[in-house]
Amino acid sequence: MPRATSDAKLLIQSLGKAYAATPTNLKIIDLYVVFAVATALIQVVYMGIVGSFPFNSFLSGVLSCIGTAVLAVCLRIQVNKDNKEFKDLPPERAFADFVLCNLVLHLVIMNFLG
């Protein structure tokens, strides 16, 4: 059992060192993803405590947060310089795709609200 604990500590330390070498723009995107998922979790907890009377509003909020997080992950994949699949794609194009997809997502969410 002590070996598993030391392996877990080594794993966490190596992940921390690897993440410290991550560029700042990717860390900002990661923070945005964490914020979006945390907001969705807060909405789910609120729904569990208070109730979900306007259920379409609850669904719209959660789907908006999760959809935005998914789009941000796609942006992170496209902007990452180590990713060889998107070498020819400029970061400006990836960001423009992100903004356009977010616009479409939120138009659909607003339409769902009624």
UniProtKB/Swiss-Prot annotation:
GO BP annotations listed: protein N-linked glycosylation
Membrane disposition: Multi-pass membrane protein
Topological domain ranges for the Lumenal compartment: 52-54
Ranges per topology, Cytoplasmic: 1-30, 76-93
Pathway entry: Protein modification; protein glycosylation
Entries under InterPro entries matching the protein: DAD/Ost2
Keywords: Apoptosis, Endoplasmic reticulum, Membrane, Transmembrane, Transmembrane helix
GO cellular component, one term: oligosaccharyltransferase complex
Transmembrane intervals: 31-51, 55-75, 94-114
Subcellular location: Endoplasmic reticulum membrane
Main location per the UniProt record: endoplasmic reticulum
PANTHER family: DOLICHYL-DIPHOSPHOOLIGOSACCHARIDE--PROTEIN GLYCOSYLTRANSFERASE SUBUNIT DAD1 (PTHR10705:SF0)
Record's subunit section: Component of the oligosaccharyltransferase (OST) complex.
Protein role: Subunit of the oligosaccharyl transferase (OST) complex that catalyzes the initial transfer of a defined glycan (Glc(3)Man(9)GlcNAc(2) in eukaryotes) from the lipid carrier dolichol-pyrophosphate to an asparagine residue within an Asn-X-Ser/Thr consensus motif in nascent polypeptide chains, the first step in protein N-glycosylation. N-glycosylation occurs cotranslationally and the complex associates with the Sec61 complex at the channel-forming translocon complex that mediates protein translocation across the endoplasmic reticulum (ER). All subunits are required for a maximal enzyme activity.
Family listed: Belongs to the DAD/OST2 family.
Name of the protein this chain belongs to: Dolichyl-diphosphooligosaccharide--protein glycosyltransferase subunit DAD1
Native organism: Oryza sativa subsp. indica
